[in-house]
A protein has these predicted regions:
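C-terminal and inter-domain tail/linker signature
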Residues: 1-130
C-alpha cells in the first residue's frame, strides 16, 4: 500500500520543525494558518498566521532547558493528519515525559488549522505550575 500524501506532508513538517527550517514550514503551513495550543503551558492559546506560528514553535524550545520530541506515529486521511509523539522536557531541574497529539486539517496540500493536545494535561499543568 502506498503512503498517503498527507502522511508525507506530516513527515516533512516534523523534519522541518526538528531542523528549525522555517522555509520548508512556510511551504507546508498555509499563510492564514490557525494553530490551537492546548494544555496549561506558557505558550497556550491560538496562534494566527504563519509568522505567529513560527514564533510559537521557536518559543516552545526556548522556554525549556531540554526539549526532545520523538515521533511515534502518523495517521492520515483525505483531509486530516494526526501526529503522535513523545516529548522529554527539562526545565529548572525538573523533568517530564509526556505523550502529545497534533491534529492538522489539510487543504490543497497545506495545513490550514492545527490542534495540539497533551495526553496527560494534569501532569503538564503540574510541571509548569512550579
Amino acid at each position: 500500500m502506498a503512503e498517503h500524501s498527507n502522511t508525507a506532508i506530516a513527515q516533512l513538517a516534523w523534519d522541518a520543525v526538528s531542523r528549525s527550517d522555517g522555509e520548508t514550514l512556510g511551504q507546508i503551513l498555509a499563510p492564514d494558518i490557525v494553530w490551537h495550543a492546548t494544555g496549561n503551558t506558557p505558550w497556550r492559546g491560538d496562534h494566527n498566521g504563519l509568522d505567529a506560528v513560527l514564533d510559537y514553535l521557536a518559543r516552545v524550545g526556548e522556554l525549556t532547558d531540554v526539549f526532545d520530541a520523538r515521533l511515534t506515529d502518523v495517521l492520515a486521511s483525505e483531509s486530516r493528519v494526526l501526529i503522535v509523539f513523545q516529548v522529554k522536557v527539562e526545565h529548572t531541574g525538573r523533568k517530564m515525559e509526556l505523550g502529545y497529539l497534533v491534529l492538522a486539517r489539510i487543504e490543497d496540500g497545506r495545513a490550514r488549522e492545527v490542534w495540539t493536545s497533551p495526553l496527560d494535561p494534569d501532569a503538564l499543568a503540574r510541571f509548569w505550575a512550579h
